Regions:
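Glycan-processing catalytic domains of CAZymes
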Residues: 1-187
Length: 187
């Protein structure tokens, strides 16, 4: 895995050099258990620091869907991941993005409007600078279903739900949010 990290970081730096008008990003796996040790690092913050430095990363990006499992399920790793990303972004003075679950698949449920709002707003509460969606379109493999863009390339009900959430956020918070800087998070 360390060799893979080096190759990925090299590719990222090359993309920055060859296409400075583009914004390459490498989405990180979420932290869980001993993943840092699998990559050869003591802990996840050390891995994130090394990645940012080696890739000359201008932002961090990750996803963690553990709270979107079917049935009653609570996993503290959701907030642990937000904290790790937030702290690394603050240490390096770069933004972090969260890719939230928009499309049910495998054991992940179909996120309701409240689920989507919760994923977005918990990310923003931790200082997230960008929200992306997994996945925007419906892949034709496995059991992906009910994406914002359906298997026929048409807008689905989920697309309209996300549009309405964005409109609501922008109307309420857009003017102030972009000027804020995360200092503390409490729950």
């Amino acid at each position: 895995p360390k060799g893979v990290l080096k190759a990925v970081c090299d590719a990222h730096r090359i993309m920055l050099d060859l296409a400075p008008d583009r914004l390459p990003f490498i989405n990180q796996f979420p932290y869980h258990g001993n993943i840092a040790q699998l990559y050869g690092f003591i802990n996840w913050p050390e891995y994130l620091d090394r990645f940012v430095e080696a890739a000359n990363a201008t932002q961090l990006s990750y996803d963690c869907y553990c709270q979107m499992m079917e049935g009653p399920y609570e996993n503290p790793l959701y907030f642990q991941n937000l904290e790790y990303m937030r702290d690394a972004a603050l240490r390096h003075r770069i933004p972090f993005w969260n890719i939230v679950l928009a499309t049910p698949h495998f054991r992940y449920r179909a996120p309701s409007k409240d689920d989507m709002r919760w994923q977005i707003y918990t990310s923003l509460a931790y200082g997230c600078g960008g929200i992306l969606y997994f996945t925007w379109y419906t892949p034709l493999t496995c059991n992906y279903r009910d994406a914002p863009i359906d298997a026929h390339g048409e807008r689905s009900e989920r697309w309209y739900m996300l549009r309405d959430l964005h409109r609501d956020f922008r109307a309420r918070f857009e003017r102030v949010y972009l000027g804020l800087r995360s200092q503390h998070v409490y729950h």
